[in-house]
């Protein structure tokens, strides 16, 4: 569903990517900053119960996920290493979101059911990524599924 917006989103992100490249910021730096920011925001905001502010702050850092690849392509440096780094750090960002939500629901006054659901979302999110990576490492195409990463995080 959200994949339909990719072309339009690229037009929005191009000027930002160009500005960062002019400032000599590398795609890997953008990847790291985005991940560290998303992890910190998720682990600070969600356990504190900032369930409206937290997603906005986390989303600001997750936007870097579309910037780093854009920047690498503009530099002609789109590489397997960059792809590996990006997808690996994405898992840390995703995990922090679910851990932050689980910590919130583990607090007083909440049902453990919600904590369990956040933990299940973490497990299934990691499993989805692992299954795709493993299939691709075996030469299989693994493009199927009901939701992309962006859609899984949105839900």
Region locations from a protein language model:
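Topogenic membrane-insertion module of multi-pass membrane proteins
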Residues: 1-56
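Membrane-interfacial loop-to-transmembrane-helix junctions in polytopic alpha-helical membrane proteins
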Residues: 23-26, 46, 50, 75-78, ...
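Alpha-helical transmembrane segments of multi-pass membrane proteins, especially transporters
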Residues: 27-31, 57-61, 87, 117, ...
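Short glycine- and Lys/Arg-enriched binding-loop motifs that mark or flank ligand-binding interfaces
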Residues: 30, 50, 65, 78, ...
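Lipid-exposed faces of alpha-helical membrane segments in multi-pass integral membrane proteins
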Residues: 33-40, 56-60, 64, 99, ...
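Membrane-helix exit/interface motif
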Residues: 44-48, 67-71, 100-107
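Acidic (Asp/Glu-rich) catalytic motifs at the cytosolic membrane interface
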Residues: 53-99, 127, 131-136
């Amino acid at each position: 569903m959200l994949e339909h917006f990719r072309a339009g989103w690229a037009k929005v992100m191009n000027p930002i990517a160009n500005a960062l490249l002019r400032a000599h910021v590398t795609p890997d730096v953008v990847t790291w900053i985005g991940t560290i920011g998303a992890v910190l925001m998720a682990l600070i905001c969600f356990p504190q119960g900032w369930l409206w502010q937290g997603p906005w702050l986390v989303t600001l850092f997750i936007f870097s996920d579309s910037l780093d690849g854009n920047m690498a392509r503009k530099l002609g440096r789109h590489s397997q290493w960059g792809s590996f780094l990006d997808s690996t750090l994405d898992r840390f960002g995703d995990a922090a979101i679910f851990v932050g939500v689980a910590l919130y629901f583990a607090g007083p006054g909440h049902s453990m059911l919600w904590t369990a659901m956040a933990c299940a979302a973490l497990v299934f999110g990691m499993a989805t990524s692992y299954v795709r990576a493993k299939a691709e490492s075996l030469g299989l195409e693994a493009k199927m599924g009901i939701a992309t990463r962006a859609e899984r995080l949105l839900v």
